């Protein structure tokens, strides 16, 4: 169903891959992009469970907006193994204004399609989503 505000639909594969990440843990991350011509959000890249946070960060384009989901594993101060699912809205300052507007207006609706997001992060440059930021937001 298209979003009235931005006219964006969400491809079924987006939800399916997210469920695989959440329930089966078969992916470390998923990068989503908006296909403007088809007016829908689609899966652009899927990260294997063995890939690192650096691999994930490197998969985001330098000058284009993206949505991403990252399954972050960490150990608490009490030495407990935990996991948090992050939703990251990547919107670099160097992206086209039109692209930033489309991603901003579609974000909330898209995020609602992904049931199980635990932490949301908005990032305009790599320092705003560095591993230190992820670690502090996970706790």
Curated annotation (Swiss-Prot):
Keywords: Actin-binding. Belongs to the actin-binding proteins ADF family. One of its GO terms (molecular function) is actin binding. Actin-depolymerizing protein. Severs actin filaments (F-actin) and binds to actin monomers. One of its GO terms (cellular component) is actin cytoskeleton. This is Actin-depolymerizing factor 1. Gene3D superfamilies: Severin. PROSITE patterns: ADF_H. PANTHER family: COFILIN-RELATED. Residues 5-139 form the ADF-H domain. It comes from the Eukaryota. One of its GO terms (biological process) is actin filament depolymerization.
């Amino acid at each position: 169903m298209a979003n009235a505000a931005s006219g964006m639909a969400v491809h079924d594969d987006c939800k399916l891959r997210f469920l695989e990440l959440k329930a089966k843990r078969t992916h470390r991350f998923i990068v989503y992009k908006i296909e403007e011509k088809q007016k829908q959000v689609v899966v652009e890249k899927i990260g294997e469970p063995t890939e690192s946070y650096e691999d994930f960060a490197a998969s985001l384009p330098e000058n284009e907006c993206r949505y991403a989901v990252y399954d972050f594993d960490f150990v608490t101060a009490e030495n407990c193994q935990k996991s948090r699912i992050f939703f990251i809205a990547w919107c670099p300052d160097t992206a086209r204004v039109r692209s930033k507007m489309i991603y901003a207006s579609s974000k909330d609706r898209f995020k609602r399609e992904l049931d199980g997001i635990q932490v949301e992060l908005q990032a305009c440059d790599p320092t705003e989503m560095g591993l230190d930021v992820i670690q502090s937001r996970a706790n």
